Design a protein with these regions (language model features):
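Acidic, low-complexity intrinsically disordered segments
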Residues: 2-220
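Residue-level marker for beta-strand->alpha-helix junctions and adjacent short loops that shape enzyme
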Residues: 16-17, 83, 109, 129, ...
Length: 334
């Protein structure tokens, strides 16, 4: 059996553009933090790397990269979403100018790999399905290449607890965890089903409670966001998880207040609303997109066309949860 080689990995989380909805610069100033949320993707990948590899994280939204960071690093990981594209490209060029091999991955490189051709490595798709292949190649001496995970096949029940220890927690308004990937709906404008598929895959209850235990043991308290794109995508699994989550909260005197994203059909399930409230969910982001039924039909937002949206929102309010509404302004006229 080959012995894993030591490797120093510098993970760089790119800056969001200032005009992006993900920036929240003024809100962060008001709340006395540097960023709303921490980089969950990179710290999850960090947990998948060999134990002989050492990881250092720099969130470029909250801190600057130092000469010592580059001198220490054998390899750089970066990548993110579309609003981070410009800074990701800047970081790739910066790494190349310092003679450091750079690995790029994440949603935007997976969707548009040609834009990131300057990176030494592209690791595309969900990390669980490809990271071991990349690590083996690196340790065998490969110094460039494209590694692509099979689509929609990552086994999230094998995903390790993220490396929360890499974060400067005080920099963030809240932290995040992920329960599921994928969404059963087919909204025309959304890339989630292109990245993760239409069959939501969920972690196990012991996995999720292990993540909460890790945060609790670190001393973290307060707002914790389930970053799932549709938390109720797999209701069958969720109904099994929520009572265990509520029990976990109750035995620890409710250390966390949860938020998440869900489709508006959450309002159709009073029992599910009750279970979320019992687990101490206080807020849900709901994509309303448009009040115009014709526009909703055109964007294939079927779940919003079958109801009185205002009444649905008030049902969620009635369960004791705030609703943050998402709208698309200037959608194509079809």
């Amino acid at each position: 059996m080959n012995t894993p080689c030591p490797c120093n990995v510098l993970m760089l989380y790119p800056r969001f553009t200032a005009d992006s909805v993900w920036s929240f610069a003024e809100s962060c100033k008001l709340m006395g933090v540097r960023r709303p949320a921490a980089p969950l993707g990179l710290i999850t990948v960090a947990a998948m790397l060999p134990g002989s590899w050492t990881v250092r994280l720099v969130d470029c939204n909250t801190a600057s990269i130092t000469d010592d960071d580059f001198a220490w690093a054998d390899l750089v990981f970066t990548g993110g979403m579309l609003p981070q594209q410009a800074d990701t490209l800047r970081l790739i060029e910066l790494c190349r100018s310092r003679g450091k091999p750079v690995v790029v991955g994440g949603p935007d490189p997976t969707s548009s790999p040609h834009i990131y051709a300057a990176a030494d490595f592209q690791v595309l798709g969900e990390a669980e399905g490809v990271i071991d292949e990349f690590v083996a190649a690196w340790e065998s001496g490969v110094r460039s290449g494209v590694f692509t995970a099979p689509k929609f096949q990552a086994d999230v029940t094998k995903t390790p607890v993220p490396r929360f220890d890499l974060l400067n927690i005080q920099d963030y308004l809240y932290l995040g965890v992920q329960y599921s990937r994928g969404c059963p709906f087919t909204c025309e404008f959304c890339d989630i089903i292109e990245l993760y598929g239409r069959v939501p895959r969920t972690k196990t209850t012991p996995q999720m409670l292990a993540e909460l235990d890790a945060l609790y043991d670190m001393g973290y308290r307060g707002h914790l966001d389930f970053v799932d794109d549709n938390f109720i995508g797999n209701k069958k699994s969720l109904r099994l998880f929520l009572p265990e989550l509520a029990d976990w909260q109750r035995t620890r005197d409710y250390p966390f207040e949860f938020s998440t994203e869900a489709s508006v059909n959450l309002a159709d399930d009073p029992k599910l609303l009750e279970m979320m409230a019992a687990a101490n969910f206080f807020g849900v982001f709901v994509g309303i997109e448009s009040p115009d039924p014709a526009t909703l039909v055109a964007m294939k937002k079927k779940q919003n066309t079958r109801r009185n949206i205002a009444e649905s929102i008030h049902k969620i309010y009635g369960a004791g949860m705030l609703v943050t509404a998402g709208f698309i302004v200037g959608f194509d006229k079809l």
